[in-house]
C-alpha cells in the first residue's frame, strides 16, 4: 500500500448531459375558487360530489430574440352534487376551482425537435406538484375535503394536443 492517491477515474462519460432547461420563476397567474350556492350547500350536501377535472398546457415565447418561454398549466376542477337517482344528471355545482400556474423558463441549446416536448411535457411535469398542492389546499380551505389530483400523463396530453390545429403563438 502506498501513500499516493490515484487521480479519480474520468467520469465524464458517465455523466448524463445537462438538461437544456432553467426554470427562472414559478407563479400563480390566476386563481379562483367559487361556491355558487354559498353556505346553503354545506347544509344540503348529502353525498360526495362528482368531480371533473380539465387540464390544459400552453407555452409562449416571451421574447423573439431569446429562448425564454412562459408555460402555463391550467386546471379547472368542478364539483357537482351527485345525482339523486342512478343515471340521472348531476345536480348543481358545489364548487369550482380554477388555477393557471405559470413558469418562465429558459432553454439553452435545446435541439429544435426537443423544444416542444420540453415546454409541453417536461415543464408541466416539473410544476405539477405545486399545482396539485394549491388545488388541494384551496378546496380544503374552502370547507371541502381536499381534491388530490392524480398524476397526469403529459406525454399523452401533448400528443392529443398535436392532433388538433394550434393557434398562433403557442408552442
From Swiss-Prot:
Annotated InterPro entries: SecB (IPR003708), SecB-like_sf (IPR035958)
One record GO biological process: protein transport
Location(s), subcellular: Cytoplasm
Metal-binding found in the keyword field: no
Keywords, in A-Z order: Chaperone, Cytoplasm, Protein transport, Translocation, Transport
One term under GO cellular component: cytoplasm
GO MF term set: unfolded protein binding
Predominant location: cytoplasm
Keyword DNA repair: no
Domain of life of the organism encoding this protein: Bacteria
Family the UniProt entry places it in: Belongs to the SecB family.
HAMAP family listed in its UniProt record: SecB (MF_00821)
Quaternary state and interactors: Homotetramer, a dimer of dimers. One homotetramer interacts with 1 SecA dimer.
Function: One of the proteins required for the normal export of preproteins out of the cell cytoplasm. It is a molecular chaperone that binds to a subset of precursor proteins, maintaining them in a translocation-competent state. It also specifically binds to its receptor SecA.
The protein's name: Protein-export protein SecB
Organism (species): Gluconacetobacter diazotrophicus (strain ATCC 49037 / DSM 5601 / CCUG 37298 / CIP 103539 / LMG 7603 / PAl5)
Protein encoded by which gene: secB
Amino acid at each position: 500500500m502506498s501513500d499516493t492517491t490515484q487521480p479519480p477515474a474520468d467520469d465524464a462519460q458517465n455523466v448524463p448531459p445537462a438538461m437544456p432547461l432553467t426554470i427562472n420563476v414559478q407563479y400563480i397567474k390566476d386563481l379562483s375558487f367559487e361556491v355558487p350556492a354559498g353556505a346553503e350547500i354545506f347544509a344540503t350536501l348529502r353525498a360526495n360530489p362528482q368531480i371533473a377535472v380539465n387540464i390544459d398546457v400552453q407555452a409562449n415565447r416571451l421574447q423573439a430574440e431569446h429562448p425564454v418561454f412562459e408555460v402555463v398549466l391550467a386546471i379547472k376542477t368542478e364539483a357537482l352534487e351527485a345525482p339523486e337517482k342512478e343515471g340521472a344528471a348531476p345536480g348543481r355545482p358545489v364548487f369550482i376551482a380554477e388555477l393557471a400556474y405559470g413558469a418562465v423558463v429558459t432553454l439553452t441549446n435545446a435541439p429544435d425537435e426537443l423544444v416542444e416536448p420540453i415546454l409541453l411535457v417536461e415543464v408541466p411535469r416539473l410544476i405539477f406538484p405545486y399545482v396539485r398542492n394549491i388545488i388541494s389546499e384551496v378546496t380544503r380551505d374552502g370547507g371541502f375535503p381536499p381534491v388530490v389530483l392524480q398524476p397526469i400523463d403529459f406525454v399523452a396530453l401533448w400528443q392529443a394536443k398535436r392532433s388538433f390545429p394550434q393557434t398562433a403563438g403557442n408552442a
